[in-house]
């Protein structure tokens, strides 16, 4: 009798797990036979946080601890550079963006720099008392840029940063943000700092619109796919897609390709339309059938790093997309597909 009673909790747990798994799409993951990525390891153990290229060969990478590196061979090799800022100021360089020879660089705390000569010289600009810290910068046109902060405030400049004008009238309802993306046409999407909701801002609008998360799981990240629809990464290694940009409350069932105790931190689409998702402890998976099945990447799985950002760069100045995956502790991957 005692044995029967103690088995009841186990049965309940089994039924609960069956119910939970039935509400998800668990695909299973096998290891790919080959990889389109090559590993680059820097001596500097700082974390790479963003990368951009001016043309096919010339680009910059920025990261924590004032890290800035330059490549002149398409990202195959990198050389460390320095910025003209006081040695005692330790900045976390978050974002860099170029359009032609003009570029913008932002960091925390309160750093904005501007170049008009492909990064040979950088000018530090005064921000004044903006709400929040710089989070994302976008080069729009000659002398024109948009700056988003950690409080979801967005500012624009049309005179190379001499003055900034508020684009969002009142971001106070947003609170802080943990993720924020912008499309080339000026649409934004963000995730609240706690991951309990996400918000959208259409180009030309001055008001964020808040949306409920797709489930009780907190949102890790959100972004746009090549068609302009949204994807969502949630706690518990869940992946979701929104197929209708007119209904942002409608999401696919959660896809859970692999349960290894690590969440996915970013997603990206390669030039062939394959979907890549990266996360903790060398987790990097790819789907070649729109998320139905997934494979694990053999190069990434052997690296002692967390993959925090997946970038496929596409702009007029580039003959073809460039791909990089940024990891922690001096690791990045370069696309060779």
From Swiss-Prot:
Lipidation residue positions, type S-diacylglycerol cysteine = 24
Subcellular location per the Swiss-Prot or TrEMBL entry: Cellular thylakoid membrane
UniProt cross-references to InterPro entries, sorted A to Z: PSII_CF48-like_dom (IPR028203), WD40/YVTN_repeat-like_dom_sf (IPR015943), Ycf48/Hcf136 (IPR016705)
Residue ranges annotated as transmembrane are none
The membrane topology term of the UniProt record is:
Lipid-anchor
Keywords (A to Z) from UniProt: Lipoprotein, Membrane, Palmitate, Photosynthesis, Photosystem II, Signal, Thylakoid
Positions of N-palmitoyl cysteine lipidation: 24
A GO cellular component annotated for this chain's UniProt record is: plasma membrane-derived thylakoid membrane
**Subunit structure comment from the entry:** Part of early PSII assembly complexes which includes D1 (psbA) and PsbI; not found in mature PSII. Binds to the lumenal side of PSII complexes. Interacts with YidC.
Q: Quote the NCBIfam families the UniProt record gives.
A: PRK13684.1
Which family does the UniProt entry place this protein in? Belongs to the Ycf48 family.
Q: Say what the protein does.
A: A factor required for optimal assembly of photosystem II (PSII), acting in the early stages of PSII assembly. Also plays a role in replacement of photodamaged D1 (psbA). Assists YidC in synthesis of chlorophyll-binding proteins.
Q: What is this protein called?
A: Photosystem II assembly lipoprotein Ycf48
- Name its species: Prochlorococcus marinus subsp. pastoris (strain CCMP1986 / NIES-2087 / MED4)
Gene this chain is encoded by: ycf48
């Amino acid at each position: 009798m005692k044995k029967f009673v103690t088995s009841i909790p186990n049965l309940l747990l089994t039924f609960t797990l069956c119910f939970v798994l039935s509400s998800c799409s668990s695909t299973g993951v096998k290891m790919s036979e080959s990889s389109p990525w090559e590993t680059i390891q820097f001596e500097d153990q700082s974390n790479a946080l963003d990368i951009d290229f001016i043309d096919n060969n010339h680009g910059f990478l920025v990261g924590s601890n004032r890290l800035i590196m330059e490549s002149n061979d398409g990202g195959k090799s990198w050389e460390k550079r320095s910025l003209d800022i006081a040695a005692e100021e330790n900045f976390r360089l978050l974002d860099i963006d170029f359009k032609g020879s003009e570029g913008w660089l932002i960091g925390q705390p309160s750093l904005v720099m501007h170049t008009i000569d492909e990064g040979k010289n950088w000018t530090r600009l005064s921000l004044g008392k903006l709400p929040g810290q710089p989070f994302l910068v976008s080069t729009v046109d000659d002398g024109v840029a948009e700056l988003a902060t950690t409080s979801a405030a967005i500012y624009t400049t049309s005179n190379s940063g001499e003055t900034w004008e508020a684009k969002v009238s009142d971001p106070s309802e947003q609170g802080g943000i943990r993720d924020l993306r912008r499309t080339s046409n000026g649409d934004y999407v963000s995730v609240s700092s706690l991951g309990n909701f996400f918000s959208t801002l259409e180009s030309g609008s001055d008001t964020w619109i808040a949306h409920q998360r797709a489930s009780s799981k907190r949102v890790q990240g959100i972004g746009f796919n090549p068609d302009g629809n949204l994807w969502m990464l949630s706690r518990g290694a869940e992946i979701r897609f929104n197929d209708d940009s007119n209904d942002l409350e409608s999401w696919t069932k959660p896809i859970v390709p692999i349960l290894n105790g690590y969440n996915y931190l970013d997603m990206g689409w390669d030039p062939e339309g394959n979907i890549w998702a990266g996360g903790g402890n060398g987790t990097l998976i790819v789907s070649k059938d729109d998320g139905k099945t997934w494979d694990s990447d053999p190069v990434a799985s052997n690296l002692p790093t967390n993959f925090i950002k997946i970038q496929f760069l596409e702009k007029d100045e580039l003959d073809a997309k460039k791909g990089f995956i940024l990891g922690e502790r001096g690791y990045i991957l370069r696309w060779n597909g």
